[in-house]
Structures are given as structure tokens and as C-alpha cells.
Amino acid sequence: MTHLDKTAGSATSGSAEEFVGEIREARPRDYARIAELAGQLGYPSSADEIAKRFDGMQHSNENAVFVAQLGGEIAGWVAVFVYRVVEADARAEISGFVVDERYRSQRVGMHLLARAERWAREKGCRAIGLRSNVIRDRAHAFYERHGYKHVKTQKSFRKDL
């Protein structure tokens, strides 16, 4: 196993910022576990549904999903994409982020977040954002500890088609 530092990708030797594991791009064999963790996030999905979503994303180099693997198990994942709009410069957006309840407060989320941020910088993005349900106070505190600032409160609207 690889020791990862807080840049979530470079090898290092013993520091308080480490965990024993690997941050890597998601693979088809991860779909069932990604689906299981999506359920913990509040978005129940099957492995087949995850596979279909990945199939739709794999033709773009502006989407990525990274997993944290610890001891042979996927402990969490983060999905990130480049968000392009007319009215502002491109930025990265984290569309999904979950760490298994059993692995929280063990630096897994920190390493996943760092990997998503590094990917965004590699894509030329100068900012990264995310949206988080108002009830997720613990997640909000985590984001703030890692340099994210609450920039606005808004209502979200959706229409089924």
C-alpha cells in the first residue's frame, strides 16, 4: 500500500497527515461499492445505474471520479467536473463526495478532496466549488476547515422531464 500525503498522490514517509491507502481513478469493478456509498449519501443507486452514468461520462475528459482504497475496500469517492458557463470563467464543481461512515475522521475525505482539487488545477480551473444540503452541518465544517467558503444560499428548483 502507498502512504499518501495531503496532496493525495505523492509518496512520503511518516507524518500526522498520512493514511495508508491509495487515491485512484474509479474502475468498473468499483461500481457496486460506489453505488453502496451513494446510498449513504442519500442517493440510492444500483451498480448497473452507476455503470450507465459512467458510460455517459467516459467520453469527456472534463469529468473524473476518484476513490480512496484502504485495505482492499473503497472507503469513499469524489466526483468532479469542469463547469463551463457563458457568464463566468470555467471552474470545477464537485458533484458527489462521500466517505463511508466507518472511515470518517480518518483523513480519507481530506485526501479525496485534495485529489479533486489537483485534478481541477490540472484542467486549468482557478476555482472549485460544491453544493451541500443545508442539513449537513458536519460536512460544512469539514469544507470550511479545508478552505472552502460559504458564498451564497439559494433555492434549488427542478422539473422532471
Model regions and ranges:
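Conserved acetyl-CoA-binding loop-helix of GNAT-fold acetyltransferases
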Residues: 105-118, 141, 145
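A short, internal acetyl-CoA/4′-phosphopantetheine-binding micro-motif in the GNAT/acyltransferase core
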Residues: 97-104
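Active-site/acyl-donor-binding loops of N-acyltransferases
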Residues: 2, 153-160
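Acetyl-CoA-dependent GNAT
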Residues: 3, 25-90, 95, 113-115, ...
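Conserved GNAT acetyl-CoA-binding A-motif
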Residues: 120-132
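Conserved acetyl-CoA-binding loop of GNAT-fold acetyltransferases
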Residues: 144-153
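Conserved N-terminal entry element of GNAT/NAT acetyltransferase domains
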Residues: 1-29
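Conserved beta-strand-loop-alpha-helix junction that forms the acyl-donor binding cleft
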Residues: 130-139, 158
